Amino acid sequence: MVPVASAPAVPPAEVIAAFCRKWRIVEFSLFGSILRGDFNLGSDVDILVDLAPDAPWSLYEWTEMIEELRELFGRDVDLVEKSGLRNPFRRHEILNNREILYAA
């Protein structure tokens, strides 16, 4: 369990849903230290997204998404695209220990 004093405020579900609709995200999950007991004031928020197949985002838009998420969570974020999880061990660990906040 993450101590309340060090846990970031997770935006309300409707804010996450609006963000996902805007960026054509079909699934939005948290993973990593935010869900474990080792989250601290210096931790970033690990976010896994699954984009719609026709989402045309370039590196520029990806950077915009990260900046918007930093504002929403009030701290640094590590944004990972589900299709980019190529290492089978890391993929297994993330997919089995995530918390889905939005699914279209």
Where are these regions (language model features)?
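Short hydrophobic/aromatic beta-strand micro-patches
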Residues: 48-50
